[in-house]
Amino acid sequence: GKVDIHAEGIRPEWTDDKASITLDDLLRMQSGLAWDETYELGTPITEMLYRQDDMGDYAAARDLAHPVGAHRQYSTGSTQLVCDTVRQKLGVDDRDEAAALPYRWLLEPLGLRSARWEPDASGTTACGSYLWMTPRDWAALGMFARDDGRWDGKQLLPKGWMRSSTTEDPAEGEPEPYGSTWWLRTGAHQPPYFRSLPKDTYWMSGHDGQRTVVVPSADLVVVRMGFSPTYADQDPRVEQLVRAAIDAT
């Protein structure tokens, strides 16, 4: 109840059309802010991750390329803005206190002892990147989502959060179905991969082929780790692994 994800005017420097951007827009990658997620020299994603002391300020300064809420484009900058804006809303200015927020709210309550989530130079957690955990702890995070934010008998997320998070918004843009921070098996368009999996499947997609796949109907979470620079989303092996696990249950 401390932060309203549908409220406008969330950042004081946004006094133009950007003032209508909400946290929900950022979570759903439909803020309209100009972005390029291509990992090449000079693109916004590499500029933010490797050259900016305050990643949130950098992402907030991007110009609008589309009307707010009308176009979906995956952006690590949007994820960074969520954490930076929530930190501001909570009035947390101390660097160490800011870096401790995700541990206090998420990682410690779930008992994810291996987790290391790196902050940027300003102290704000680099929420779209730099989260290191063992496969077992990634699986625990997937189980937390599968159980609608309930853990060890406590409801840590509002009831129905995952239903909302795994519902696609009708914004135009990238064809792969996307909810609120989760890639989806079912949406306005069929994804080019994972088509053999149940329709309620959703997943986290990390760098170079890392995946945490949640299949609620099969009561299943599958984690694929590794460092595979040549991995492509259309690579069938993760889908085959999840399919085999489902068939074995």
Positions of PLM-derived features:
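Carbohydrate-binding/catalytic loop surfaces
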Residues: 43-49, 120-133, 183-190
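Non-transmembrane alpha-helical segments in soluble domains
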Residues: 24-27, 56, 60, 83-87, ...
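Active-site helix/loop module of the DD-peptidase/beta-lactamase fold
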Residues: 1-33, 61-64, 91-129, 133, ...
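Structured C-terminal helix/loop/strand segments within mature extracytoplasmic catalytic/sensor domains
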Residues: 201-249
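Catalytic cores of extracellular degradative/oxidative enzymes
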Residues: 9-14, 19, 25, 32-60, ...
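Solvent-exposed loop and edge beta-strand segments that line ligand/cofactor-binding
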Residues: 66-75, 126-132, 204-211, 229-230
